[in-house]
């Protein structure tokens, strides 16, 4: 059924094809979980190589990548590049959330139905002035999403903040989720 989904953007279609090509030898959910975990570890290590967590992160990274052939590992890198390309072409989207839902990976038992980006954009547009006021008064402001999914609301808030020219150093975005993979997508 997930193969029948048609995505609107070239990067999403390419991502879907690569994802499904990895699912010949591995279960869909495992490929997604492994890809998201590896991508999150790569981002975390690129930002902070001195953390006490770096060694355990790299150990997890290696144990995941050992399951995949060199060609499959290369597809992980290509999939990450497609996400970057997609977000650079259009930052006003929830690339991973749309992929997650479109590939049929949500878990209705956990209540995983991601809010569409258009709804998140509307909420962000309504909320941004109050956040901007708080940042101006206190020198900083935060936005917390306690069930962040792939982070669509936080992405929309960030995009609204950019449009309002709110200094990024005055904002703290926090995303949490009961599902580790969803939190790593954020």
Describe the role of every protein-language-model region.
Residues 86, 97, 102-104, 111, ...:
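Residue-identity detector for glycine
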Residues 94-129:
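Class I SAM-dependent transferase core
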Residues 48-52, 108, 132-136:
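Short, solvent-exposed secondary-structure capping/transition elements
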Residues 1-101:
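A short N-terminal interaction module
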Residues 117-185:
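Conserved S-adenosyl-L-methionine
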Residues 22-29, 109-114, 143, 147, ...:
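Short, charged/polar micro-motifs that form catalytic or ligand-binding hotspots
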């Amino acid at each position: 059924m997930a193969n029948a989904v048609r995505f609107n953007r070239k990067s999403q279609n390419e991502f879907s094809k690569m994802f499904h090509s990895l699912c010949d030898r591995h279960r869909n959910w495992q490929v997604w979980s492994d890809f998201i975990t590896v991508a999150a570890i790569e981002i975390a290590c690129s930002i902070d190589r001195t953390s006490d967590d770096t060694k355990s992160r790299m150990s997890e990274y290696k144990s995941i990548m050992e399951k995949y052939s060199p060609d499959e590992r290369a597809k992980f890198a290509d999939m990450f590049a497609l996400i970057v390309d997609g977000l650079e072409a259009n930052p006003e989207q929830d690339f991973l959330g749309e992929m997650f839902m479109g590939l049929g990976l949500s878990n209705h038992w956990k209540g995983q139905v991601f809010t569409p980006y258009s709804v998140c954009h509307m909420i962000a547009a309504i909320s941004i002035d109050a956040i901007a006021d708080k940042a101006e008064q206190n020198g900083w402001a935060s936005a917390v999403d306690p069930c962040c999914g792939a982070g669509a609301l936080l992405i929309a808030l960030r995009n609204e903040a950019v449009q309002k020219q709110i200094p990024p150093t005055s904002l703290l975005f926090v995303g949490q989720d009961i599902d580790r993979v969803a939190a790593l997508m954020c």
